[in-house]
């Protein structure tokens, strides 16, 4: 399975689990146990937009893109990204 297939398979389960749409997927990496995926999710909308609060999540996926575990790595303001 390639990175694009992992993203397509994992995204519906991630959306269901978080009850939110990820803003972006910042990384997908293969490892010996499967895959690790990082994504940013809007936690709190603000004005101006640069003050939006995002959570960065890490998902540990098996070889078939099923979620084994996840955690919040950090919270960031949109203006701090990049």
How would you label these PLM feature ranges?
Residues 2, 31-33, 68:
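Detector for Asparagine
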Residues 49-75:
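A short, surface-exposed beta-strand/turn
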Residues 1-28:
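Short, non-transmembrane alpha-helical segments in secretory-pathway proteins
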Residues 78-82:
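A short, polar/charged loop-to-alpha-helix boundary motif
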Residues 26-59:
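Exposed beta-strand-loop-beta-strand "reactive/processing" segments of non-cytosolic proteins
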């Amino acid at each position: 399975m390639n990175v694009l297939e992992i993203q397509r398979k994992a995204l519906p389960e991630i959306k269901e689990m978080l009850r939110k749409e990820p803003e972006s997927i910042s990384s997908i990496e293969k490892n010996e146990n499967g895959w690790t995926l990082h994504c940013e999710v809007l936690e709190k909308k603000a004005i101006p937009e640069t003050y939006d609060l995002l959570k960065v999540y890490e998902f540990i996926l098996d070889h078939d893109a099923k979620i084994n575990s996840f955690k919040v790595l950090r919270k960031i303001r949109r203006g701090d990204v990049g």
